Design a protein with these regions (language model features):
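N-terminal pre-domain segments of enzymes
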Residues: 25-99, 448-449, 453, 462, ...
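Extracellular beta-rich repeat passengers
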Residues: 27-59, 66-73, 289, 294-457
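Acidic Gly/Asp/Thr-rich repetitive segments characteristic of extracellular carbohydrate-active
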Residues: 85-129, 496
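Short, T/G/N/S-enriched strand-turn elements that build extracellular solenoid repeat scaffolds
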Residues: 95, 115-122, 138-147, 166-170, ...
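Right-handed parallel beta-helix
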Residues: 137-271
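A structural signal for beta-strand register positions
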Residues: 151, 156, 182, 211, ...
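Structural detector of coil-to-beta-strand junctions
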Residues: 168, 196, 219, 260-264, ...
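Extracellular calcium-associated, cysteine-rich motifs in secreted modular proteins
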Residues: 460-543
Length: 543
């Protein structure tokens, strides 16, 4: 079917209008002097963190674990020989994380001090963070992850698990693995409009089974980092490289200032699969960088004026087998209702209608049989200065662009898998995610007055309680004594957690975190072994 016969008049009129309606314009008030002072304090705190960790960064560089802040291509960062964890896929699959490093056990919910989340994240050197406390970690200022080689294992928390609240967690390094964590910011101070989880990530990043909500810019954003060259000069905006966000949820970005945005993501060798974007007006998600962008098996629900958009003339989109479900806030008589992708073009200099390329197939738009049957029958929309018909022909490609290894499902299968398994499902799914999943499944939102778009968390019940008693048999290495005894390990070995007993590339604590038998050798060269062994609600891949 020819593109010029399937693009509707309504779509042409919509995409050719450059002005934004009032509801799409942000309305940030001017910050007060007190607010500006608060921002200055946050910036000073990060400078203090950088100064504190610098000697250790230099020491670890001599040990073969350097910080590489100038990375701008996938090959600039070394890759591990085995997956970051069983079930890791995509561009970030071979992140080192904190493998072989010091183990931090989070034992209290304070903002700072010994045994806190901040202490572990703002340290330097390879490190693995486990939890022996449940509850809300109420941050007073952002947490800055400024040193590479970090693994955060939220699945280790007792009871209902933990939730990071009040401020942002900012990833400004490489080789960072974050699993089964909740980041629910909820701050509405205009001076501090930031993401729940974001930052300036360099690369080798994988975010898995995390839940991000109630951000004031976006909920979960990772796509670029700023690099300051030695000797001064202008800071360089570089792409994040080797990144995966998988099995995660970005929901209910706050909208007091017309800015309830889900995510800006991207980078080089970037993969985003089995995620859910729900009840965000826009950026569901937005593509924040040039180059390859692979979006597979995601679910989008209840957007208002933007679904997937962004990129530039050097973008190569794989938009494959995603499920788009309009909600109460999605306009009924507007092309946005069935929009799958809106690629952006060069605007600053000629040629002004220079778009990238897109492989768009297998996506389902619930309620629109035409676009579901043929995603190019109005699902790809542009805002050109010239004739859109030949431009759409030039954007379209019938073969996918090269991307990292990934196990894919149909859009309908992915819809069920995402609702069953996305977000911080361990140690258990919390009331927020349970409610969001129910809203997606039924199409009925909790906050009816805002059609699912909220300005304050009180409109949806606020924070739930997270309860759980600390385990009594967890030592400094973060591994329960009972688990060591179960596998007849040497309980008196102070270095046991960091040992690779089977020579398969995984340490004892990594096998504990992944629910694996530490006495068995795993052949990681067989992709069939790279399966999440922690949760049964994710599908079993057939590789």
């Amino acid at each position: 079917m020819k593109i010029d016969t399937i693009l509707t008049v309504a779509a042409l009129l919509a995409v050719c209008s450059p002005s934004r309606p009032a509801w799409a314009r942000e309305s940030w008030p001017e910050p007060t002097e007190a607010a500006k002072q608060r921002v200055a304090e946050f910036r000073q705190h990060e400078q203090d963190v950088l100064k504190h960790i610098q000697p250790e960064l230099e020491a670890w560089a001599k040990k073969g674990k350097p910080f590489i802040p100038w990375a701008a291509k996938p090959g600039d960062l070394p890759q591990a020989k085995v997956p970051a964890f069983p079930g890791a896929e995509g561009g970030g699959e071979f992140s080192f994380g904190g493998r072989g490093g010091r183990i931090y056990v989070v034992t209290n919910l304070a903002d700072s001090g010994p045994g806190t989340f901040r202490e572990a994240c703002e340290a330097a050197g390879p490190r693995i963070v486990v939890f022996n406390v449940a509850g809300i970690i109420q941050l007073q200022k952002p947490v800055f992850i400024d040193a590479p080689y970090l693994t955060i294992a939220g699945q280790t928390a007792p009871g209902d698990g933990v939730c990071v609240a009040g401020e942002s967690t900012l990833v400004n390094a490489h080789d960072v693995v974050i699993r089964y964590m909740r980041f629910r910011r909820a701050t509405t101070n205009v001076f501090d409009r930031d993401d729940a989880l974001g930052g300036n990530p360099v690369g080798n990043i994988i975010v898995d089974h995390c839940s991000a909500s109630w951000g004031l810019d976006e909920n979960l954003s990772m796509y670029r980092h700023m690099y300051s060259p030695p000797g001064g000069g202008k800071d360089l905006k570089l792409p994040t490289v080797n990144i995966t966000i998988q099995w995660s949820i970005s929901s209910e970005s706050l909208n007091p200032y017309n800015h309830a945005f889900g995510s800006t993501i991207g980078g080089l060798n970037s993969t985003f699969h089995h995620n859910l974007w729900a009840c965000n007006t826009a950026r569901n998600p937005s593509v924040g960088m040039y180059g390859d962008f692979t979006l597979v098996n995601n679910v989008l629900f209840n957007w208002h004026h933007r679904t997937v958009d962004g990129g530039d003339e050097n973008s190569y989109f794989n938009i494959i087998n995603n499920y788009f479900k309009p909600g109460p806030d999605t306009p009924t008589n507007d092309p946005i209702r069935y929009r799958i992708l809106k690629p952006e073009a060069r605007r600053a200099k000629p040629p002004v209608d220079d778009f990238g390329k897109a492989y768009v197939t297998g996506n389902v738009v619930e309620g629109n049989e035409k676009v579901t049957a043929d995603n190019w029958a109005g699902g790809v929309q542009i805002e050109p200065l010239g004739d859109p018909v030949p431009l759409l022909r030039g954007i379209r490609t019938d073969q996918p662009f090269a991307h990292a290894l990934l196990t894919a499902q149909s859009a309908v299968e992915a819809y069920q898998s995402v609702l069953a398994g996305a977000g911080a499902t361990l140690p258990k799914r919390d009331a927020v995610d349970t409610r969001i999943i129910d809203e997606v499944r039924t199409g009925k939102v909790t906050y009816e007055a805002g059609r699912g778009i909220i300005t304050d968390i009180s409109q949806v019940g606020g924070y739930p309680e997270y309860q759980g008693a600390p385990a009594k048999d967890i030592g400094a290495d973060g591994i329960p004594l009972a688990w060591k005894k179960k596998y007849k390990l040497d309980v008196n070995d102070p270095d046991l957690a960091g040992r690779d007993l089977q020579g398969d590339g995984c340490t004892v604590i990594e096998k504990y975190l992944a629910g694996l038998d530490p006495t068995k050798n795993i052949d990681w060269s067989n992709p069939r072994n790279n399966v999440n062994t922690l949760t049964a609600d994710t599908f079993k891949p057939a590789r």
